[in-house]
């Protein structure tokens, strides 16, 4: 099983629609400073020893300019999904994030990133592969509705041969009072609940596992405290394809969009 909680809002000065959420698995397109912890509790396929399996991560993002158009992001995983014990896994870095379209209700962002072999190989939590990825992320809001789309292509450039394509989409509805046109970036109500549904398809195009296609759905519940800019999110990742990595994954994410300058100054 996989379980996740997430916390989110928008950074001070960002005028994005309040209906634009940070989905559980789908990557959001809007670029902001972000601090988030992701917890994942996994029900493994074929797990017969009864051990609790988890895969958590620290997610940090930075906005490089006042227009929220350039940014970078890093994902640092920590799990016990290997052969023995828990440790850091392979780190993912989105080196360049650029928003080609950067409007309150529509954001289209291009990504160039890398996956680095930082994991503990002896514990089965990493390998010798260095991979690069290119992606397009879309956020689209209409009143209290949100739609997100990801197109990602990743390939190993050092190590075992493998190329993967991911298609992911999310839809959500946020219960923001008084919305007639643009959902307020800073609603007057203390708490904003949202319900979401995500669909993720991961296809291995080349390599030892060529032809593998893992499809999962993720229903989710989000709660945003708009006054503090903190938010929490829960979801369950459920496989719907014959190929699957886990029986269930329970997700819990907690996070915020605090300006890094305000944190360190």
What label would you give each PLM region?
Residues 8-158, 162-265:
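Transmembrane beta-barrel domains of Gram-negative outer membranes and organellar outer membranes
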Residues 4-6:
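N-terminal signal peptide c-region/cleavage motif recognized by signal peptidases
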């Amino acid at each position: 099983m996989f379980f996740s909680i997430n916390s989110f809002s928008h950074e001070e000065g960002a005028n994005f629609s309040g209906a634009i959420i940070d989905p559980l698995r789908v990557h959001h397109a809007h670029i902001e400073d972000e601090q988030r912890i992701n917890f994942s509790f996994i029900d493994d396929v074929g797990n017969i020893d009864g051990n609790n399996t988890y895969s958590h991560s620290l997610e940090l993002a930075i906005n490089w300019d006042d227009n929220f158009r350039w940014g970078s992001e890093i994902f640092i995983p920590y799990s016990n999904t290997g052969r023995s014990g828990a440790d850091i896994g392979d780190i993912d870095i989105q080196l360049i994030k650029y928003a080609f379209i950067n409007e309150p209700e529509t954001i289209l962002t291009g990504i160039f990133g890398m996956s680095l072999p930082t994991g503990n190989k002896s514990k089965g939590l990493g390998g010798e592969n260095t991979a690069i990825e290119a992606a397009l992320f879309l956020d689209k809001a209409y009143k209290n509705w949100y739609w997100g789309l990801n197109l990602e292509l990743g390939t190993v450039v050092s190590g075992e041969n493998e190329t993967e394509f991911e298609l992911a989409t999310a839809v959500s509805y946020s219960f923001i009072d008084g919305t007639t046109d643009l959902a307020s970036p800073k609603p007057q109500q203390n708490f904003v609940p949202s319900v979401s549904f995500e669909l993720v398809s991961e296809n291995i195009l080349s390599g030892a596992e060529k032809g593998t296609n893992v499809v999962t759905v993720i229903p989710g519940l989000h709660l945003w405290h708009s006054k503090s800019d903190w938010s929490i999110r829960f979801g369950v990742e459920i496989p719907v394809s014959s190929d699957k990595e886990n029986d269930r994954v329970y997700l819990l994410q907690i996070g915020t969009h605090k300006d890094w300058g305000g944190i360190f100054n």
